[in-house]
Amino acid sequence: MKKIFINHRIFKAALFLGIASLLVSCQVGKTQAGDNMDAGDTIPMKYAQHLTMVKHGEEYTEVILANPWKEGTLLHRYILVPKGKEGNETVTRLALRRASSARCATDTVRTPVTSSVVFTGPHCQLMYELGCKNAISGVCDKNYINIPDIRKRVVDCGSSMQPDIERIISLKPEALLVSPFENSGGYGKLDKLHIPIIEAADYMETSPLGRAEWMKFYGMLFDKNADSLFTHIEQDYLHLKTIAKKLPQGLSVLTERKTGSVWYVPGGQSTIGILLKDANA
C-alpha cells in the first residue's frame, strides 16, 4: 500500500477555496466600464476568466462577474465604495448617473464589510485565512464548518437551501456570500432584504488557480489585500503539480457527497476535475 504525502499548506489552501472538499472579462488594460460608469484601470488577472475588477482611483472599485452559464452575458456587478463622508458623496453621484437599463444586477457595497452571513464553508475558511473572521456574523450549513472559533461564536442561519430569514435579519449583515446556481430563478426572500448578495461563482472558473484568484475580490470586500496569500498558493500549487507528474497514476479519489438521492460528481473540465488531473489522480 502506497503512502502519499501531501503538502499541508497547499492542502489547507485547497480546502478553504472549496477545491479539495470542496469575465469572460469585459476588457483589458484601460477599461471603460459599462452603464455610464467612469473609465478606470483594470486590475490584472492571471488565471480568473469570469472576474474583472476596475479601479477608479481611491473613490471606488467596480467588480464585474461574467455569467459562466451564458456566454457573453453578465452575472452581477458590484460597486465597492469606502465608508465615510466622501464615500457617501460617491454613492450619490454614481446613483444619479447609473443607467436604468443596466445589463445585469448592480449592488453598491460599502467597504470594509464588518458583518456578513456566509453560506459556504470554503469561504468561511478563506475569510479566516485573510484575517477577517470577525466579520462573519452568521453561517449556513454550520455542520460543514470545521473552524472551532467560528462554530462557537457565529449564529447558525440554517441550511443554505432554506436559510432562516428571521435570524439573518436580526444580524443586520452588510453582505451575504452565497453560492449561485444555474437557472436558480433568484434568491427568493433573500432578494427582498435589500442586502447586497455576493454571488460567489468562483467554483465555475476554468482552473483551480482561476478559482483561487477570486480571493482578491473577496479580500477587497473586507479591506484585506489577498495578493500575498494568492502568490504563496500559486507557487505551492505549481510546485506540487510538477511533483505529481512524476508519480505513478492510478490513485482513486472519492469526491463530493450525496445530496438527497443524488451523488453529484465533478466534470472533467471543472475546477475539481482539473485539480485531480493536476494531482495525477
Sequence positions of predicted segments:
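Bacterial Sec-dependent N-terminal signal peptides
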Residues: 1-33
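Hydrophobic/aromatic ligand-binding patch that stacks against planar heteroaromatic rings
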Residues: 5, 126, 167, 189, ...
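Bacterial Sec-exported substrate-binding components of ABC uptake systems
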Residues: 26-121, 225-254
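A short, structured surface patch at a secondary-structure boundary
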Residues: 69-170, 174-180
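Short, solvent-exposed loop/turn and secondary-structure capping segments
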Residues: 127-131, 187-190, 266-268
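Short, structured coil segments at secondary-structure junctions
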Residues: 132, 153, 193-194, 279
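Alpha-helical, coiled-coil/dimerization segments enriched in small aliphatic residues
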Residues: 142-145, 204, 265-281
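Extracytoplasmic substrate-binding proteins
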Residues: 164-167, 174-177, 183-264
